[in-house]
């Protein structure tokens, strides 16, 4: 599933080609996503100029003069730029054609993504209860410490809770906990303030670096420019269960936490 760095990579790839451009038409070949694409999307968006392409958590917000298209890539979706009129292949469900001659094409083999229309996106039911962005000053170790008091849930699913902080998915939670030396099974309420301060620093560092590297290449992900990400080449824990720790050589262990696989080093993480 594309996580925050992958979505931000996509945003940075498509924004320069969309912002300031006028939409000539919208072609919806299959509206059956996680939530149906609005039947009148072409009517709502065609003729409008795209003002800004923003991101909130893992949602892309394509802001027009009136209204905003909220897009989520789901498990396997991607948005990329193609020449308008390029014949569509299987799973290429939507084209947003621009007067420039380019089209923003949405591909989603599993159809778990979304394309929704809203006049007030930040108060949309999918966005209104989201926590702070991890790369802003609204998120820090103090917030993690305060929100974790009395929590018996394991620390990994705690930091993956979008009400606590957005965009820390399975890959980056695994890597940040490894870098901070925290066992992902530890109860969130038992982690000290000092260790949460360290964890927040690592979350920010790892997410920022992953964005710089173009995200993580996993299964279907490609950026808005059609290129894969390269952060996977530098993973220390995620997907490495049974392999030696790159720091100490101990065999990494894999456990299930909140229905997700979690890999950790029993020596480096306490």
From Swiss-Prot:
EC number per UniProt: 3.2.2.23, 4.2.99.18
Q: Does the keyword Transcription apply?
A: no
What's in the keyword line of the UniProt record? DNA damage, DNA repair, DNA-binding, Glycosidase, Hydrolase, Lyase, Metal-binding, Multifunctional enzyme, Zinc, Zinc-finger
Q: Where are the zinc fingers (FPG-type)?
A: 236-270
Q: List the disulfide bonds.
A: none
Question: Which residues catalyse the reaction?
Answer: 2-3, 58, 260
Which portions of this protein are annotated as coiled-coil regions? Answer: none
Q: From which domain of life does this come?
A: Bacteria
Which cofactors does this protein require? Zn(2+)
Q: Which SMART domains match?
A: Fapy_DNA_glyco, H2TH
What InterPro entries has UniProt attached to this entry? DNA_glyclase/AP_lyase_DNA-bd (IPR015886), DNA_glyclase_Znf_dom_DNA_BS (IPR015887), Formamido-pyr_DNA_Glyclase (IPR020629), FPG_cat (IPR012319), MutM-like_N-ter (IPR035937), Ribosomal_uS13-like_H2TH (IPR010979), Znf_DNA_glyclase/AP_lyase (IPR000214), Znf_FPG/IleRS (IPR010663)
Give the multimer and partner information: Monomer.
Q: What is this protein called?
A: Formamidopyrimidine-DNA glycosylase
């Amino acid at each position: 599933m594309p996580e925050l760095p992958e979505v931000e990579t996509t945003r940075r790839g498509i924004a320069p080609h969309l912002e300031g451009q006028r939409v000539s038409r919208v072609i919806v070949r299959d509206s059956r996503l996680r939530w149906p694409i609005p039947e009148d999307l072409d009517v709502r968006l065609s003729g409008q100029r795209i003002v800004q392409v923003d991101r909130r958590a893992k949602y892309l917000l394509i802001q027009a003069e009136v209204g905003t298209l909220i897009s989520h890539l789901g498990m396997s979706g991607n948005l990329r730029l193609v020449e308008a009129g390029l014949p569509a292949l299987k799973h290429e469900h939507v084209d947003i054609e621009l007067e420039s001659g380019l089209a923003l094409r949405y591909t989603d083999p599993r159809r778990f993504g979304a394309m929704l229309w809203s006049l007030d996106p930040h108060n949309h039911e999918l966005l209104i209860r989201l926590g702070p962005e991890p790369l802003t000053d609204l998120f820090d170790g103090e917030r993690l410490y305060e929100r974790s008091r009395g929590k018996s849930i394991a620390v990994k699913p705690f930091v993956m809770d979008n009400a606590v902080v957005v965009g820390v998915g399975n890959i980056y939670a695994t890597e940040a906990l490894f870098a901070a030396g925290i066992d992902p099974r530890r109860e969130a309420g038992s982690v000290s303030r000092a260790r949460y301060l360290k964890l927040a620093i690592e979350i920010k560092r790892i997410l920022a670096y992953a964005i710089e590297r173009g995200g993580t290449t996993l299964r279907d992900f490609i950026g808005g420019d059609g290129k894969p990400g390269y952060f996977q080449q530098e993973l220390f824990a995620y997907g490495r269960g049974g392999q030696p720790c790159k720091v100490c050589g101990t065999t990494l262990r894999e456990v299930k936490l909140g229905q997700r696989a979690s890999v950790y080093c029993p020596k480096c993480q306490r």
